[in-house]
Each structure stands twice: as structure tokens, then as C-alpha cells.
């Protein structure tokens, strides 16, 4: 019943905007389902590969109890005193917050959700260039591919390394000047503003400047740009640099020990700092599975068809739900020392996935059974023939089995 209500609301928004875009993400500290801007939706899911990354984060945290969680990060929401910078961010998250309200009174108080910002940029690009078939199942893989490219001390070297990867992964030929523009544009404009409106204006300005210099006729270039944007935004990597360099906050900010995958950019002028390329201590190991529904299809689809399309996204991560729920339940109890509200919020999130998980799994199993039934009835005249084929195929795997099959 709860799931149906959730799907109904999504369906209504999809019909309203004419285009749907989903980001499936995981966060090691807090997860949730929320509507995002421009008809994009951030749907929390638990992908086994990402859970592996989160576990690594947890191991690192256990080794050194002083490694900060997101609420202790310099770029996260403040924990004490007046939270003026929270106002715009809270409004975009919940739609209501008093100017002097404390973070604990807000729905997601302890981390900045980069996935909504990422979805905003990517949905603009996908809408604009009508890329109708784009599915990126696992951002964790892309992190591993792109992160080594940032292990240099100048933007020029980083640009060259990324160009090479763009050609290797996407067969996209991107000029060095364009890559530099993308890198500096992303860095200068996409600092994680607490105010969603400010962020939207900055990203729109960047996209407009990019459009003037980019050959948009090649969708592979656009796809690579989307991927790069998501790596930079969802990883939270570059953004702590500006905060660390802020003298007013430097004493209060906790700077964690610097692991091997930090890069030192000396050519950033006033932004000189050790910049974490992938903030493992922030546990932002996001798995971003992207499924756009093209406008022409949305207009022709019934509400039931849209619901099926929505459920298609988390199916692959359904097994991860079963694995991840105990992990998050334990994490909720261990890390929830900030009050009853926070505990209820986190347990409530887990309860949602506990309710939704069986529905998604059941739907997944039904689809697989339907597929196997279709395969059997289409290829074999009766069950005996299918059984004979299955046994001989199995025997063929053993030494001498091929002869028996013949």
C-alpha cells in the first residue's frame, strides 16, 4: 500500500514533467527516498558492489576513531549554533525550515546529498540532447577507472589522462582545451552550495558556456561529460578544498589523515590544499544507475507502464537490499547518538526498504519465471524434451560428456 502510494506520486510527477530520470544511490551514513528538482528522483538502493566500498569505509573508521563522519566534515551542515546556511538547503529538501532552526530539526541533517545535484545536471543534458538510451549501472567501476587520472599536480596532466580514458571507455574524442574547460568549469561552479537555487544557477552558467565550445553532435562526448560530472559531484572530492582554505573555519575544521589517493594541486592559486579525489571518510560510495524515460514514450505510456519502468531500476540491486538491511540497522543503532528523532528517521528509512524490498524481489522473480517459461514453451514441444536437453547439456560439461550428447 505504501509502495503503491509512492509509485503513484512518482507517476504523477513524471506525467507532469514529461520526462523521468532516476539516480539509484547509496550512502554509508543516511539513506532516503526523496523527490529532487526538474523531475529527477533520487531513489536509495543497496548495491552489493557499493556495500563493499562502504564496508571498507567502516573498517577505516574502526582503525582510527577520529576519522570524521559527514556531520563532522568542513563542507557538511553545521552541528551547533545558528544554521543560517542550512535554510536554503533545508527548503529544497523538505520545503520548510526556520532561519534559526538547528540541523537536528531537519529531515536529513548530517550530509549533503550530491546525487540530487548530479541528477539535476545530468537530467538537463539528457533532456537537451535527447539521449534516449543511456544506462550506467555501476558508478563504483567508473570511480576506479577515473580516479587515477587525477593523481597529478596540474590540470593539464589531469586533462590528458582523462582524454585517454574517454577514448578508451567511450571512444569519445575530446580536445585538450575542452577537457580543461570541463575540469575548471566543474571545479569553479559546482561547489556544493547549501542553497539549491544558487547551485542551479551556477551549473546552468557552466552548461551554457560549455555548449558554446562543445560539439554536441557526438552523444559520446555528452555521455562522458555526464559521467565525469557525476564522479566529481557524487564523490565529493574537490569540494572540500575551498572549505579547507577558508581561514575562518580552518581551526574548527577537522582534517583527516591523508591517504595515498589524495592529489596535491599546486596550480590552483588561492585554493592550494591537499584535495581528496575520493573522500572515503565521507562514505559517499555512490552507485548511480541511470534510466531516462524519453518524452515521446512518457506521453504514450499508461500509469501502470510507468510504474513497471520505475521498478525496473532497483531490480538489479534487489539482492543488495536483503544483504544491506542488517548493515544499516546495526549502523543506525551504533551511530545514532544525536537523539530519538534521528534514530526514528534512520530506522524509518530501513523500515521503508524492508517493506519495499519483498515487492521488488517478488516482481524480479516473477519476471525471471516468465522468461524461463517463455523460453521452454518456445523451444521445446514438451517437458520431456526439455528435461532431456537439460540433462545432456549438464553431462556435456564433464569429460567425455560431449560424446554422450552426440
Swiss-Prot record:
GO cellular component, one term: chloroplast
Major localization listed first in the record, in broad terms: plastid
Keywords: Chloroplast, Plastid
Location(s), subcellular: Plastid, Chloroplast
UniProt protein name: Uncharacterized 46.2 kDa protein in 16S rRNA 5'region
